[in-house]
């Protein structure tokens, strides 16, 4: 399994607008591509967000990056041409430990 993580560092004045966009439009549309099993959206501070996209295979991630990412990135840049910094990373899951119930 792969995690494709996108981190946004946003100017504080844009934070709520970016969060609304991500939760209300961007992430649901990406999920609808069928390339990811699960998507998780997190906030580290009022203006720092991380989205983790869980892909079952490299082929699924490649399909997203080739067939869908250019469109989504262009739309995002159109709506937010400035005021934020984006970083992207791909993580390969090595091992998962089960959580025990208390």
Whereabouts are the PLM-identified features?
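An amphipathic, aromatic/His-enriched active-site/gating alpha helix that lines ligand/cofactor pockets
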Residues: 31-37, 54-90
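Active-site-flanking beta-strand signature of metal-NTP-handling nucleotidyl enzymes
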Residues: 2-8, 50
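Residue-level signal for secondary-structure boundary sites
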Residues: 14, 59-61, 96
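Short amphipathic alpha-helical segments
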Residues: 14-39
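Structural beta->alpha junctions
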Residues: 9-13, 56
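Short, low-order "capping/linker" segments at domain edges
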Residues: 90-102
């Amino acid at each position: 399994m792969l995690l494709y993580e996108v981190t946004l560092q946003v100017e504080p004045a844009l934070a709520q607008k970016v969060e609304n966009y991500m939760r209300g439009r961007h992430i649901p549309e990406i999920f609808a591509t069928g390339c990811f099993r699960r998507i998780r959206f997190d906030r580290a501070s009022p203006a720092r967000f991380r989205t983790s996209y869980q892909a079952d295979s490299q082929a699924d991630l490649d399909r997203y990056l080739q067939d869908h990412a250019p469109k989504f990135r262009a739309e995002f840049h159109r709506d937010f041409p400035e005021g934020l910094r984006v970083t992207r990373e791909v993580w390969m899951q090595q091992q998962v430990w089960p959580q025990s119930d208390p």
